[in-house]
Amino acid sequence: MFKRLVFVLMLIGTGFSNIANAALELVITDGIDSARPIAIVPFKWEGATKLPEDVSAVIASDLQRSGKFSPVPTSKMPQTPYSEEQVNFGKWTSMGVDSLLTGTITQNAEGSYVISYQLVDIVRGQLTQGQSKALSQDGQLVLSKDHVLFNKVATVPASRMREYAHRIADLVYEELTGERGAFLTRIAYVVVNDKDPYPYQLRIADYDGYNERLVLRSKQPLMSPAWSPDGQTLAYVSFQNGQAEIYMMNIYSGKREKLTSFPRHNGAPRFSPDGKTLALVLSKTGNLQVYTMDLATRRLTEVTSGRSNNTEPFWHPDGKSLIFTSDRGGKPQIYQVNLSGGETKRLTWQGSQNLGGQITPDGKFLVMVNRSDSGFNLAKQDLETGAMQILTKTLLDESPSIAPNGGMVIYSSIYNKANVLSMVSIDGRFKARLPATNGRVRAPAWSPFL
């Protein structure tokens, strides 16, 4: 029974779906009222032609989508300063804004764009009115401008304007939260378009759905994309030869390599944190079992054994253990196995089933699909205390994938009878949805930092 359930879940998780040519668009659905107000002032541009990207709009959208910030709409801004010297601290303080990003864009002789930008601490500026002073190296009393959190300049080609906007959002996010931003990342997913001669498609896009690119198309199912730690390779499952086989593909060169083609099932590939080993699931000896493969030698090591079905391996961030889903207790639950000694322990006890587990990059939390009376929902479990929190109220949640900074989780769910990708913050307070038009998009895999 569990074997059939695993196969069904794998099919659900692959993303048998289609999407419109337009980019996926994130829509905040919950938690915006408690987000932190911030001002992303439109960057000054006096060129004769239109900019290739609205940099400030991309930054504002990124920060809003994190769920932690609520950018002030341009129409409600009391002023639009283009440098920190023009900021009226009192006007922004009265709106509850404590941070402001401002900047200018010019074009150089080579056609590239010079972006100058500053992040301003409004609270500090209000206290000092921008007149805080400090001793210089030669003993002179000079303006310290300690209300300016950072002041940066970059020269960017037109083709990379949107990419650099994500970079600025990362810098703002890290400065204000102390955590690394994950806006300059990608997602991989599987799409199906029944009207296409090659209906099964593996695609990648920026985390927000822009710059979507077709990586691979096939007449047979594609499943379970997984990123290498360097962000250059995807492992995935293909049925192009009539059975499940595991492949590895460089997303830049397109070079593909078959890794396994054992009888019956080959699936659920997952790179180790150092990229040297692949965890995978094979059924060549009967039931589904977890293995590891040394990618240099192709040597296989069996990790689990016995009469139970064991699947969905995921590496602990330290690379010393794996978590996996097993029916050894009767119903699917999540276990952890030490790779050096083989000791195995059960991690999940709440809910009739727990599947698709992933561990946050800091090793503190387990995120999984929990089945209870309310259905299949994402849940988070504290690995030290065992305390569990239901993160979502969406329908038929599956395939969670954690952002590399651990701040958000992307997953598949049902909305208005359609399959969509959704996001939830790791604390469950903020939720967003990536609606798909005329189809379904599933099996997201969030890339590492790029």
UniProtKB/Swiss-Prot annotation:
GO CC term, one of those recorded: periplasmic space
Protein keywords: Cell cycle, Cell division, Periplasm, Signal
GO terms (BP aspect): cell division; protein import
Predominant cellular place of this UniProt entry's protein: periplasm
Record Pfam families: PD40 (PF07676), TolB_N (PF04052)
Stored PANTHER family: PROTEIN TOLB (PTHR36842:SF1), PROTEIN TOLB HOMOLOG (PTHR36842)
Role played: Part of the Tol-Pal system, which plays a role in outer membrane invagination during cell division and is important for maintaining outer membrane integrity.
NCBIfam families assigned: propeller_TolB
Annotated HAMAP family: TolB
Family stated for the protein in its record: Belongs to the TolB family.
Assembly and binders: The Tol-Pal system is composed of five core proteins: the inner membrane proteins TolA, TolQ and TolR, the periplasmic protein TolB and the outer membrane protein Pal. They form a network linking the inner and outer membranes and the peptidoglycan layer.
Record protein name field: Tol-Pal system protein TolB
